[in-house]
């Protein structure tokens, strides 16, 4: 099946059946995407831009043919072997890493997600000190420092203070 550059109700239905790992993709594909490809049955590829990962949705238990198509499209769009991060299921991650290695490329899947949808959050057993504060312009220096430390700790999307202020 050919790939379209739009999504429709068919895609939203696919994602609705995959709520635990790809629920947030429903919201992402409704926004501005640099790349959006879908066959409306087996494969959705979405990329909004740096510093965000490429999202590749495939159905559970997808055949090698679909995983190969996903890899080929990722490569054709410049996402393979350039340090790009991906949100993909484990089967596709393993396939893409193996395929890249066969081609003499190194590919790392550094972003894994488990669940974004949490309809019944669990309250903490111990009440934390403090409260919620909405940031204002006066909090910019503290927010930039927080972002810098956070990104240093996780080792991705590293920018200097000027980059975090943008």
Where are the predicted features?
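Conserved beta-hairpin
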Residues: 25-49, 166
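A conserved beta-strand-loop-helix scaffold within acyl/acetyltransferase catalytic domains
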Residues: 49-50, 154-166
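Short C-terminal domain-edge/linker segments immediately following a structured domain
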Residues: 117-119, 147, 163-165
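Short, low-complexity, polar/charged sequence segments that are solvent-exposed and flexible
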Residues: 73-77, 104-107, 133-136, 151-154, ...
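Generic structural signal of hydrophobic/aromatic residues within well-ordered alpha-helices
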Residues: 24-25, 67-70, 96, 150, ...
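An N-terminal domain-start capping segment
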Residues: 1-31, 82-100
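Short amphipathic alpha-helix that is part of the acyltransferase structural core
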Residues: 1-22, 122-159
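Acyl-donor-binding surface of acyltransferase catalytic domains
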Residues: 33, 43, 50-129
């Amino acid at each position: 099946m050919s790939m379209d550059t739009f999504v429709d109700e068919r895609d939203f239905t696919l994602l609705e059946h995959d709520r635990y790992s790809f629920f947030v993709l429903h919201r992402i594909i409704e926004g501005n995407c640099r790349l959006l490809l879908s066959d409306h049955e087996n494969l959705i590829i979405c990329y909004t831009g740096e510093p965000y990962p490429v999202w590749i949705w495939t159905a559970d238990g997808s055949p090698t043919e679909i995983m190969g198509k996903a890899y080929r499209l990722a490569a054709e769009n410049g996402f393979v072997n350039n340090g790009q991060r991906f949100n993909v299921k484990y089967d596709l991650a393993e396939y893409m890493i193996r395929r890249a290695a066969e081609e003499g490329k190194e590919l790392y899947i550094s972003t894994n997600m488990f669940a974004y949808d949490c309809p019944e959050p669990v309250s903490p057993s111990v009440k934390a000190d403090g409260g919620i504060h909405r940031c204002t312009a006066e909090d910019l220096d503290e927010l930039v420092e927080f972002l810098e430390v956070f990104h240093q700790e996780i080792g991705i999307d590293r920018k200097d203070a000027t980059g975090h202020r943008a």
